[in-house]
Amino acid sequence: MKPWAAFHLIFLVASSVEGDVSNYGTGGTQDTEPTCCTEHQCISDKIILQGQPGIPGIPGVPGINGSEGLKGDPGPQGLPGETGFDGIPGVAGPKGDKGDQGDKGDKGDKGDKGDACILDDCPPTDVEVRNCQDLLEHGEILNGWYTIYPTKENPMVVFCDMETDGGGWLVFQRRQDGSVDFYLDWESYKKGFGKQESEFWLGNDKIHLLTSSGTQQLRIDLEDFEGSRTFAKYSSFSIGDENEKYRLIVGSYLDGSMNDSFRIHNGHSFSTKDRDNDTNKGNCAMMYKGAWWYFHCHHANLNGLYYKGKHANYADGINWRSGKGYYYSYKYADMKIRPQQSETTVS
């Protein structure tokens, strides 16, 4: 039943009872005290009826948040967590300062004896090897490039001829195929140039050093394009330093299979196309396309142009006046020195 219907029924009952009570009071046969039901409370002449609870109302609007309370005291420290994974390595720091030198270590055991060294990578040895003759006396018998020590401070790589005329010759000039340009300047002849496997000029500074202590014999070998070989040998050979313009000092002609064409250059300075030290009004090096101890100008021109035998130009090839003359250029030429010996073998 709806609440309002129940209330209406109670109201009608109440009205009916009120009518009955009124009748008892005015003209009824019995005048008695009014009686109320257990649910009713009688106050004076009114009856107050108690109805059932109504439906709950809609919730009100939430109130405003209160102000923030004070910060509480720190709680007790928790247990340590598990170890995390290793991180990525950081960037390397700057290089530190160089540390102090360590103490000298103990001396090691003596090593095994090495193989014989004959090439240009040989280290210094206790054996005094000043020239190719010293190498020959210490058992080196093969032609090739060796390291010698004219002085302890000046090791030098040189080509040694260990076969010709008893061996022990140090070659400072070689021509054989025209693969190297010999028409070069003063600085090139000073320092040296060329290829070990073919043609080269050792260098005037080195030639001066090699000939400045002890008497050196000189041998010149030539070969023409017909295969004929000739040579000339001189008792001594040396050149001055650069301040002396590499002045030539050559001794007497000893022997050979070709006549002398070199001693006439004795006492003359070295000339190149850019350094004219000859006695000619012109520049002999430029005229005859070489570099040499020219006077006015030459009887030998072993640093001239490389022609294959006969040539039309006058005296600008590898010429030897007393040999094939000024219009023939030799196929092969070399100049070499060796310490003077008491006895000489000719070949």
Curated annotation (Swiss-Prot):
Its main location: secreted. Keywords: Complement system impairing toxin, Disulfide bond, Hemostasis impairing toxin, Hydroxylation, Secreted, Signal, Toxin. Residues 121-341 form the Fibrinogen C-terminal domain. The keyword Signal applies. It is found in: Secreted. GO terms for cellular component: extracellular space. GO terms for molecular function: antigen binding; carbohydrate derivative binding; signaling receptor binding; toxin activity. Expressed by the venom duct. Residues 1-19 form the signal peptide. Residues 57-114 form the Collagen-like domain. GO terms for biological process: complement activation, lectin pathway. Initiates complement activation and/or interferes in platelet aggregation and/or blood coagulation. This is Ryncolin-3. The lineage of its organism: Eukaryota, Metazoa, Chordata, Craniata, Vertebrata.
